[in-house]
Amino acid sequence: MNFKKWTTALMLALAVSSCIQDEALNSEAAIDACTGADVQLAHINSDSKEINIYVHKGANLAKQQLLFTLPDGATIKADEHSPNDILNNYDFSNESHSRTFTVTSEDGEWTATYTVKVVPAEMPETFHFEDLLPSAGTEYDIFYEFEPGTSTNVSRVAQWSSGNPGYKLTGMTDNRTGYPTQQVTDGYRGNGLKLTTCDTGSFGAMVQMYIAAGNLFIGSFDLANALKDPLRATKFGIQYYKRPIALKGYFKFKAGEVYTDEGEVQKDMKDRFDIYAILYEANENSFMLDGSNSLTSENIVAKAQISEEAAVETDEWTAFELPFEPMNG
């Protein structure tokens, strides 16, 4: 009896072990996405293997940080090395501002060569909230604006940032419609932008950040700093080459049913929204305003901001026009 049990157990172990095999190495060779400090937008044509990377007009083309998203296990290498290439920084200061890169699959059997071109661009002057950046594995919306260049004008490109990456840490939603910043189809014309204040759940309570307000801004969101210093996690600004006169648009607004502060309900108080644009001076490219000083910094030279009286609750699309007022001399 005992012998039969032992034999059965041995045969079962052998059967299980025979099913365990090494997983096949990935055979994909492609570039799925590209980001970087100056990158506003990356247009990838998978058929022609051509990538246009739009950066702001004042970017240093001899030192472009490019972070490529590749299939699992794949590697990438510039076909010709430049003396200025250091780690993920590449030199695109040649006349065509383009170079070729080859991706090799994890199994080493497949390669794909891409022509990558860096295109200097300016900020758009109108924003429509019509387009979302396709991003594999990202469930929240990332807005961008794109106006192709002509023979006489450079391209106009901007990628919007938001606090959505920080809200993802809460685990409160796995659907794009549950995020504080999202696209909606019933905008003033076509699509629009919806900003909502959301509960951060038990995760937010643990770090004493009980709510997350929807926001949208030009700049970047520093996810690594989101928990320890959330105000400084929002980095505002991009180089701009004109003198703005006014900020115009349309809004609707509905205040939340309750107003909370540090997790406690505050009676007889209502939340409000803010719309503003600032123009500020920076002595070096690395200098950026953040959430702690975006309205108070001495570097601000002009500001357009909606007044508290004008930021009213309304179910109808309401026009606003905010003139830029000079600041700090």
Segment roles from a protein language model:
Residues 19-127:
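Beta-rich interaction/scaffold domains
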Residues 199-285:
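Extracellular-facing segments of soluble proteins and assemblies that are Gly/Ser/Thr-biased and enriched
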Residues 146-190:
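Low-complexity, serine/threonine/proline-enriched polar segments
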Residues 284-329:
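Extracellular carbohydrate recognition and processing domains
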Residues 119-165:
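Extracellular carbohydrate-recognition regions
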Residues 1-30:
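Bacterial Sec-dependent N-terminal signal peptides
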Residues 184-203:
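Short carbohydrate-recognition loop motifs
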Residues 50-51, 231-235, 305-308:
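Short structured motifs
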